[in-house]
Amino acid sequence: LMEGMANSLLTPSFTGDIDLAGKLRSHLNSDLYFTRFLPAHDDTQKSLVSMLVNTEYSDISYSSYQNIPLATSVAKVFKRSGYQTIFVYAGFEGLSNRSEYFKVQGFDEFIGAHQLKARYPKMENSVWGGQDQFVFEEVYARLENHESPAPPLFIVTLTITNHPPY
């Protein structure tokens, strides 16, 4: 998930001769890619909860219901199908109790800014956490090192680069 990045930034009609998609272009042409997508809310964190947990109650992660697993959680669906579930985020783990809450909802791991900083000491801190580059490095490393018969991976990422202040 790319916070605040409209897909128009990936289209030649918008960018002209500058191909911002780069190596992603081949995936845009061959993978499952939704060109028309509306957020569930006008806030990234609220939309995130709606998409991953399938609830409109966006404050649930720090409410009295925070420890109740929901059958509608996307991660639980993938876990039941045998996947290892991982959430990688350059933001801080404690934001709205996301780290602990997403684990309750079926994510095996929640990797946030603190874990990324420990793994990638060159990562600089920002007001929202770290740098998205290291989210992608972590995912790439996971995919490169993944071998059978290990369970397949379901990895969700959330970027923060486009969040003000830039």
Indicate where each model-derived feature is located.
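Solvent-exposed soluble domains appended to multi-pass membrane proteins
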Residues: 1-166
